UniProtKB/Swiss-Prot annotation:
Gene3D superfamilies: Ribosomal Protein S4 Delta 41, Chain A, domain 1 (1.10.1050.10), RNA-binding S4 domain (3.10.290.10)
A Pfam family the protein falls into: S4
InterPro entries: Ribosomal_uS4, Ribosomal_uS4_bac-type, Ribosomal_uS4_CS, Ribosomal_uS4_N, S4_RNA-bd, S4_RNA-bd_sf
Claim: Metal-binding is one of the keywords in the record: no
Organism of derivation: Catharomnion ciliatum (Moss)
Signal peptide: none
SUPFAM superfamilies: Alpha-L RNA-binding motif (SSF55174)
Single GO MF descriptor: structural constituent of ribosome
SMART domains: Ribosomal_S4, S4
Keywords noted in UniProt: Chloroplast, Plastid, Ribonucleoprotein, Ribosomal protein, RNA-binding, rRNA-binding
Protein name: Small ribosomal subunit protein uS4c
Length: 202
């Protein structure tokens, strides 16, 4: 299954706020939601499916990619759900988004694909590149690159940068300080339901 390229507002109306997908907020009538949910019993499968979809759309990844991340998380030490979120949060496109260099993860992916981003001084054009502690994220020394990202940072610096990241505005340099903790996740999600959804596949 490929990445979703349709209307983003339609997705957040169904799943709720997904800041990685869009900075717009869903406008829903609470009364209509309550009526629709009370009139029909929501199955456990649907609940797990929607949590899985939240992860997919927020991080902008394909079904196959998410399944692969779940499989990697299952083999790692520690809680599968927490490891899964750490893997997704340490993607380069997400790190750029969380640093405020891009308003959304799709926007961050474009910056990476167009070779605007350096990791430890080297151009990296793979959005799924897995960052690690002490990685430095910088902008390619070209006017176009600096102009694009400086505008984003100026606008989005009102949002708090999570504790596992540091951004130096003078040097225009980001640092992955550590592996993030659960409180730093930028999404309201029950990752255990996602793991349960994939229990027969992973």
């Amino acid at each position: 299954m490929s990445r979703y390229r349709g209307p983003r507002v339609r997705i957040i109306r169904r799943l709720g706020a997904l800041p990685g997908l869009t900075n717009k907020t869903p406008q829903l009538k609470s009364s209509s939601i309550n009526q629709s949910t009370s009139n029909k019993k929501i199955s456990q499968y649907r609940i797990r499916l929607e949590e899985k979809q939240k992860l997919r759309f927020h991080y902008g990844i394909t079904e196959r990619q998410l399944l692969n991340y779940v499989r990697i998380a299952r083999k790692a030490k520690g809680s599968t759900g927490e490891v899964l979120l750490q893997l997704l949060e340490m993607r380069l496109d997400n790190i750029i988004f969380r640093l405020g260099m891009s308003p959304t993860i799709p926007g961050a992916r474009q910056l990476v694909n167009h070779r605007h981003i350096l990791v430890n001084g080297y151009i990296v054009d793979i959005p799924s590149y897995r960052c690690k502690p002490q990685d430095f994220i910088t902008i390619k020394n070209q006017r176009k690159s600096e102009t694009i990202i400086s505008k984003n940072i100026e606008f989005y610096q009102k949002y708090k940068i999570p504790n596992h990241l540091i951004y130096n505005s003078l040097e225009k340099k980001g640092l992955v300080n550590q592996i993030l903790d659960h409180e730093s996740i930028g999404l309201k999600i029950n990752e255990l339901l996602v793991v349960e959804y994939y229990s027969r596949q992973a």
